[in-house]
Structure formats: structure tokens, C-alpha cells
Amino acid sequence: GPAIRNYKNNFFSELIGTFILVFAIFFIAKPNLEIQGEVINFGIGALDALPVGIVVWVIGMTLGGTTGFAINPARDFGPRLMYSFLPRKNKKPDWSYSWIPIVGPIVGGVLAGLLFNVLI
């Protein structure tokens, strides 16, 4: 479970973290941007994974303290599912909290995609 159990704050933490990650990936993956008819090249070629890694690190350092920053539904759901099949003594998979790291990142990713499409 999270270090700080506040459903509303944890949901928005996951939403914001995923929003930032997806929005950054969209800009990194698109090596040029057209603004008022002028094409601006900013792609960095083979180093594209480096800024994504830095973005994930920054998200972890800023938003990771409260929830552990799933920022990907599979990162939480897969281990939680396996944990319920392979339980450990005196531990529970905490399904009452499981919707936050699933729904928060999905909403954040959709909002990032919508905003990117509006801006581009």
C-alpha cells in the first residue's frame, strides 16, 4: 500500500505523474514541432531513452513518496494479482486501494494525449 493513504491525493499523484510522463514521451517521440508554419527540430536521435529515464526519475523523486509512483497500471496490477495467488504470511494484496494505481494512470495518460492533440 501507499506510504500515505489519502485516496484523493494519491489518485491525483498518480494522474499527474502519468500525465507528465506521457506528455514528455509524446514530445520526445516527435522530433520536430511546427509553430506558425516554422518547423523546429529538437529530436536527439539515439538518446531518446535518456530523457524518458530522467523524466521517470524526476517523477519518482517528486511524487513517489506518497504512492510509490506506479505511473503504469501494469506495474501495480500484475504484482498485486500474483501476490494474491501467492500470499505471504501476515500480508495482504490490499485490493481496496488497487483502483488508484490503475484508474489514475489511465486518466492521466488520456488527458496527456488529449492535450497533446490540442496543442499540436
How would you name each of these model-derived features?
Residues G1-I120:
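Membrane-interface helix-loop junctions and terminal tails of multi-pass membrane proteins
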